Amino acid sequence: MTARLRVRALVLAAGLAFGIAGCSPLPVRTVTIGDQPWTVYEGSANGMRGLPGFGDVDGMLFDMGRNVDPAAVGFGMEDVGYPIDIAWFDGSGALVSTASMAACEAPPCPVYRADGPYRWAVEGRVGAFSDMGPEDRLVVED
């Protein structure tokens, strides 16, 4: 089994476990982006799939645990019925890139990737990252 297939299998298994366990409500934490505090869900392999929207939180945070190659890990919108914006940050919190992800209710759905290695990804409402610049940083405290 190739490394890419192993990663996909692990993501699928984690997603199935999340769905079966019904881990709702999702854990919530606060991070800072630029000078703004954000209340975020802690992301899972399912991301926003099956959720009606962000509700009372600002977004969803994904921690890869270390900087990862964007060619190996991408984000998709399958079964998400609304558009989402995403920002990727490296291990020091520096902005790597942003993208707008279109809603996709049925495959095939595009895969969105950062422009460079990243540790953190934050999904937010459309327009959430439109004013971000290279000086804006993500701060995640343990």
Give the role of each language-model region.
Residues 2-10:
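Bacterial N-terminal signal peptides that target proteins for export
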Residues 24-142:
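Compact, glycine-rich, soluble single-domain proteins
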